[in-house]
């Protein structure tokens, strides 16, 4: 869990308390893959590892779109589903993205 007390960290904690199935969320710097703010509700979920890994995933998405002749920054959201969770990523301009992980009992709406 994040020990920081920034307003963004507080906002992520509020979101965690109100979102059924919440596991983790982070706002991540695309350049270095480090979370600028994060909150993990599930002790087994480490958002710092996920932030680094999914930064590469989002960069790969941008590269693929560029190769296809599409605008690499035209992605609204990226949704990844597994047997146990949903992960939703939203790019926040060029430099950051927001990622959230929810159990399948949760609701992304």
What is each residue range found by the language model?
Residues 28:
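N-terminal glycine-rich anion-binding loops that anchor highly charged ligand groups
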Residues 1-23, 31-109:
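Acidic, low-complexity cytosolic segments
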């Amino acid at each position: 869990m994040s020990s920081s007390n920034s307003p963004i960290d507080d906002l992520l904690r509020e979101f965690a308390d109100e979102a059924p199935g919440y596991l983790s969320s982070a706002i991540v710097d695309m350049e270095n893959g480090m979370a600028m703010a994060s909150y993990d509700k599930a002790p087994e979920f480490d958002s710092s590892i996920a932030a680094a890994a999914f930064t590469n995933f989002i960069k790969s998405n941008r590269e693929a779109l560029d190769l296809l002749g599409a605008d690499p920054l035209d992605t609204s959201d990226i949704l990844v589903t597994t047997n146990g969770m949903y992960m939703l990523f939203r790019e926040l301009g060029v430099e950051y993205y927001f990622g959230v992980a929810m159990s399948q009992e949760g609701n992304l709406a």
